[in-house]
Amino acid sequence: MSLALEQATLIQENLPQGNSLPRHIAIIMDGNRRWQRKHEQFCQKRAISGHRQGADSIPQIVDTALHLGVEALTLFAFSTENFSRSKSEVAELFSLFNSQLRSKLSFLHDREIRLRCIGDLSKLPQELQNNIEQASSATAHYSRMELIFAINYGSKDELVRAFKELHQDLASKKISVNDISEELISSYLDTSGLPDPDLLIRTGGEMRVSNFLLWQIAYTELYVTDVLWPDFTANDLLEAIKTYQQRSRRGGK
């Protein structure tokens, strides 16, 4: 048994019994750049050393969520606003995404995890679009867990794109005004077919949701930790889930 799996088993044994697990966990992976500044004497002098370290944290969290029985895990990797960063930093981030998609494909196959990417993928470099399409297609038949990366994602942008498509369907009489409902609007979103997140975790201590899944988190439990994303471990995920299980979810009632 791998060390990560041993840790996940220990975590499962220590969770409160009889309390429900979140079906869908979403994480705002914040704190990569602050981690880099904190460790700059040990880091390579590159703009995204913190992001590389953060990428190394992902497999442990995915393994833990999978072992616990979480159905969907959504990770906020790159926002629409991140395009305002320097061209060199953005280019390095896209290079990192490409290398991670290629190197981690066997990880997904071994665990039978389905990959999905949400956001306006049309604005990404063509090589990255191709790698996303290939990895998504190669894992589309898996059902143990769905791993969703939000790349060039912003919730307002998602809603604008959804409403444009909905308007086109109204104009072509594919749907009528009377068909419009919360469920119909949800079906036009990038997250169509996924349950809404039960738990949203934000690392790095900032108290905001940063234009992430605004429609979907209407009744989601929020958990903020000061731990920076590269330092976030399975034990930190356990603490978030324990806190979630201690809350009474009322769905706005």
Swiss-Prot record:
Which GO terms are recorded in the biological process aspect for this UniProt protein?
A: polyprenol biosynthetic process
Q: Name one GO molecular function term.
A: magnesium ion binding
Which Pfam family, any one of them, does this sequence belong to?
Answer: Prenyltransf
Question: Which key words tag this protein in UniProt?
Answer: Magnesium, Metal-binding, Transferase
Q: Where does Mg(2+) bind?
A: D30, E221
Please tell me where substrate binds in this chain: 31-35, 51, 79-81, 83, 85, 202, 208-210
Q: What EC designation does it have? A: 2.5.1.-
The record's active-site residues are D30, N82 (proton acceptor)
Q: Which PROSITE patterns match?
A: UPP_SYNTHASE
CC cofactor note: Binds 2 magnesium ions per subunit.
Superkingdom of the source species? Bacteria
InterPro entries given for it? Answer: UPP_synth-like (IPR001441), UPP_synth-like_CS (IPR018520), UPP_synth-like_sf (IPR036424)
Class of this enzyme? transferase
Asked if the keyword Ubl conjugation belongs to this entry, the reply reads: no
Q: Which cofactor does it need?
A: Mg(2+)
Function statement: Catalyzes the condensation of isopentenyl diphosphate (IPP) with allylic pyrophosphates generating different type of terpenoids.
Q: How does it assemble?
A: Homodimer.
**Into which family does the record put it?**
Belongs to the UPP synthase family.
Protein name (database record): Isoprenyl transferase
Q: Which organism is it from?
A: Chlamydia trachomatis serovar D (strain ATCC VR-885 / DSM 19411 / UW-3/Cx)
What gene is this protein a product of? uppS
